[in-house]
Every structure is written in C-alpha cells, then in structure tokens.
Amino acid sequence: MKTPKIGFSLLLFMGLSFTMLHAQNEVSQREVIALLELKAKTKGHLWTNQWDQSQPISTWHGVTIKNGKVVGLDLSNNNLQGRIPITIGNLRHLEVLDLSGNNIEGKVPGLFRKFEKLKVVNLADNALAGNIPTAIHKLQNLEELNLSNNRLEGELPLGISELSKLRTLALANNDLKGPIPMGMEKMKKLKMLYLANNKFSDFDALRKLSKQQLVMTDVMVKEGNLIPLDFTKSPEGLSRLEFEKQE
C-alpha cells in the first residue's frame, strides 16, 4: 500500500502553524503565509542562507521588520530557484525587494499596484522573461529599479516616465525593443541610466534627459539609429555611448 503524498497546502499549513507559535505577534498571518510560500516556491531547502522557522521571523535571513510589518526582503545571491508566487503581493508594506543574483524564472510579478511603498526593486541577474508590467507606474515612491541581465522582451511601458522619484533605472542586457517612451524628462531625479544591449529603435525621448546631471549613462546604439542631437552638444554626464554593428 502506497503512502499518500502530503499536498503542498498541507505542508504550508503545517509550516505556518509551527511558525505562528514562534511569531510572537511580530507580523500578520498574511505576511507569514507570503514568506513561507515564497520559500516553498523557490526551493527554500536549497537556499544558501535558510530560514529557521523555530526562531523569530525578525531573525530570518534578509527579512526586515518595522512596527510589526515586513518592510524589507533581501534574498540576493541566495540560490532561489523557481517562480515568484502571487502571494508575495501580501507583503504590502515592502520598501525594499531584492531578489537579484538568483535563478528565478517566469514573469516579473504584475502586482506593483499593491506595493505602494516600494522604494527599491532589484530583480537583476535572474531568468525572468516576458514584458515589464504596465502597472509599474503605480510605484510612485520607487527610487531604484534594476531588471538588468534577464530575458525581458517587448517595449517599455509608457507609464515608466511617471516614476518621478526614480534615481536609478537599469534595464541593460535584455531583449527589450521599440522606442524609449516620451516624457522621460519628467524623471527629474534620474541620475543613473543603463539601457545597453537591448534592441531599442528610437532614442529621441532621451533628448531632454541629456541636459540633466546624469552621473552614469550607459546606452548602446545600433548602427543606423539616430542619436539625439543634444547628446553631441552636451556630452557631460555621458560616460558611455557606444555603437554596435547591426547583425
């Protein structure tokens, strides 16, 4: 007689029940569920730095708690494998989300409308595919967005120019295409821009950005594309502008 398999839901319930005994009212049950499902969906047993569920959540690697809310999640370079579960949207008080340097697959979570307090999103150096969610403009407090070194495709969402507090935008080494959205000049605080090694076809939207005091601009333009004239007139701030031969 075969031993019946224990379903994922039961395992999660068992883990949740055990963890809640030790949570000491640190965070809400909703947030505990989100953390445990992230662990389960990304092979937590293989993580470089694992979570000891017998210990308070505030001691878990990469988890930052403030006033009873999870405000920071930094699991960078921690051997996460798999996909980001939709329940991560339960961490609505997150200010920092850093899952860079792992092997996370699937799409960028389209849950940005729930993360109103996010200031930093770093999902670089993974295997994420698909488009950048159109709801990204909901992150009105975002200061850093790093999606470099993935497999993202499609065009940049038009609303990305509405991220008025953004200081760093890093999208290099993907398969993004089409024009850079107009209105980038509204991003008054943008200091670091990385767009190299994509398939962008029109850089005219960067014309007014070149007048800002950009500390670092990394743009690779394919041969045959037009360069905004202001780049040649006001090269200060441009640290890298290269030409790549059309394949």
Locations of the language-model features?
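Leucine-rich repeat domain C-terminal region
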Residues: 167-177, 183-247
